[in-house]
Structure formats: structure tokens, C-alpha cells
Amino acid sequence: MNILFYDMGSYTYQDTLYYLKQLGHTCKTVYYHFPDKFHDDFFCDRFEKQLQSDSYDAVMSINFFPLIADLCHAHQIPYLAWCYDSPLEEKLEEYFSYDTNHIFLFDRIEAEYYQQLGYSQVQHLPLAVNTERLDKLQFSPAQIQKHRCDVSFIGHLYESPLQVLLYSADDYIKGYIEGILQAQLRVYGYYFIDELITDELLDSVNQSFRKVGQTSLTLNHRGLSFAIASEITNLERCFLLEQMGELFNTHFYTTKPHSLSDHVISLGPVKYMEEMPCVFRSSRLNLNPTLKSIQSGIPLRALDIMGSKGVLLSNFQPELVEYFEDGQDLILYSSMEEAVEKAAYYLQHDDIREQIAQNGYEKIKESFTYPDRIQKMLATI
């Protein structure tokens, strides 16, 4: 196939492009960074000219872009969007109904949600890892020593808007939402926040905005759900890092400032292609506290850890246990306290930990390959 690829610096672009070409497809890439992904006349003009300059069988991107969906629909060209972000921004849904769309989400529950709304163009497809590239990486003793630690986490602490949203709410509303938050914080594998956000609760929150003159702000169900999920994720990640930092040599790699204690060694960001695999391989345990609103799927971080022959210490995710066995291929926890307990145990058992790393890698190499995922996407056209 002749494929036009759009990219704005996504993590998985290079690996996807490599395997598209390995499978015999011709690819041309348009690079562009959207100031506003919903309105951009310059991009639309440039991209449309590119579409008209050749006979393309499909357009592809990592993550979904509404302007590309518009243009592909206008030209009746299939648009394949493979997403590693979840949950998707709510406004994107307005563009899902085009018959030219082929949207692939790694979270099965999120994909089923859109399918139940009638968007048959949305499908479930797990992410992939390029173990061929990772196997070729070689790290110097200095690089390994720099990143050698007991526990590491690459990511960020979510800045939830929840406290701002509830600033003008009465004590009952604040207490009710705090109860939801504390309950969900302790439950893994089942996301019940959506069930507890009633129309009456939303109406009360929105009335509290109007009482203080915020007439332009209206919060919907998904907005409040994501705010609560982000707050929970922030609390969980802070707790885990603080606890791990007090007990073990713990590294935290992030692009944003934070207020964690000095027990946690902050080393700033790392480059995805070159440095991140070294972190995963050099760390004795790699944390993966998943964003709470990712209800079932396996995030890219978890797959990259195992694909780099790192040991994954993750919260329970339904799709993880479909492919991997706890204590054999990875280490799962069902509470924050259990995460700390399991970290202490496995840090004392190097041989078990090393076997887990090898087993997880073999499962990734077998079941999470780019050729398989690409062929499944192209088969939908």
C-alpha cells in the first residue's frame, strides 16, 4: 500500500514506520505540530495538497487527529489512527462517525464504550513493542551505573483540577466526592466512579459554580470522572514513590517539578528511544501505577518495561492478566501496601526477579509485535 503518515513526535512513530516498510508498504510522512488540533487552516491546506499529489491507499497517525479525519472523509481515503493515549479527549468524539475512520484503542473497555454509542469504526487493539530494536541497544557501564537503582518510575504526577472544581461546593458534595475518591483508591481492576456520579451530583456541582458567578463553566459526567481519576492517580503515585523512597534506592524521572521528599532521587526526563530502555534494564523494579481511568488496557510504559527486559511492578489491569502471569512474567499489586511488600520481597530475590524479566520479555516478543498489529489494522480497510 501507499500510505501517507502524519506525525508530531509520537513515541511509537519510528517503530510503526519501520515495520510498515518491512512489510512492503510505501510511506511518506508529514511532520507538523498543531497549535490547535481542531482549527488550523495552514495545516489543512498543506495536508490536502499532499493528499492530491499522489494516489494514497490510506492515511495513518499515532493517536487521532480531527482535522486529518475531516480531510480523509472529504477525499474518501481510509484514516487509521492507533492511539496510545487513554482516555481520549471528549471533543474528539464529534469526528468519530466518518465511514473513513479506523480508530484503534488499547483499552478494551474504552473501545466498547464507543462501540455501544454506535461508533463501529472504533476497535480494540493492544499496543506493540519493537524488541528487535531494543535487543540491539548496548549500554556502557557508566550508563548502567547512572540508572542503577532498586525502584524507578518514569512518568509524572497528575495535576488534577478537582480541588479547584470543588472550591465553591458545599461540604456534603465535597464529602461525597472524597468518599468516592477514597473508595476507588483502594480498588484495582474495577472502575466504579462513573456509576457513582449521578445527574443530581453534577447539577449540584454546577449550581455551586453559578453561585460564585462562574456562569460560563459547566462540568459534565466525563469531566468530573477524569478529574477524580487524575486526583487518585496523583495520590497513588505520590504515596508509592514516598514509601519506596524511604525504604529503597528510588529514582523518579519526570519533566515537571514536584514536591516529593529528598528520599526520592529526581533525575529529570529521559529520551524515549535511547535512554528509557537503559532505565528499565538497569532498575531492579520498574513501577507502573496506571492512570485510574485506563480501565482495562495495558499502557505503553508497561510493555516497554518488559520489552526492555526490565521487571514490571504494576497495579492490576484486566488485560495484563490475559497475557501475563503474576509472579512469573511480571509482579502485580492489588493495593499500595502490597506494592511496597512485594517490592521488599523481590528485591531480596535476584534470581526470581531475573527470571521474571526474561519471562515477561519472551511474552512480549511472542504476543505484542508490530507486524501483527499493523496487519490487523490494514485488514480493516
Which role does the model predict for each range below?
Residues 1-75, 222-226, 250, 370, ...:
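N-terminal pre-catalytic "stem/leader" segment of glycosyltransferase-like enzymes
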Residues 2-12, 120-294, 318:
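Nucleotide-sugar donor-binding catalytic core of glycosyltransferases
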Residues 46, 68, 91-92, 274-275, ...:
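Short acidic active-site motifs
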Residues 64, 83-87, 108, 126-129, ...:
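Histidine-centered beta-alpha loop that forms part of the nucleotide-sugar donor binding/catalytic region
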Residues 72-87, 102-105, 127, 152:
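Active-site proximal beta-strand in glycosyltransferases
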Residues 73-74, 95-98, 144-146, 245:
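Short, conserved loop/helix-junction motifs that constitute active-site signature segments
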Residues 80-95, 105-106, 133-135, 220-221, ...:
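Nucleotide-sugar donor phosphate/pyrophosphate-binding loop at the beta->alpha transition
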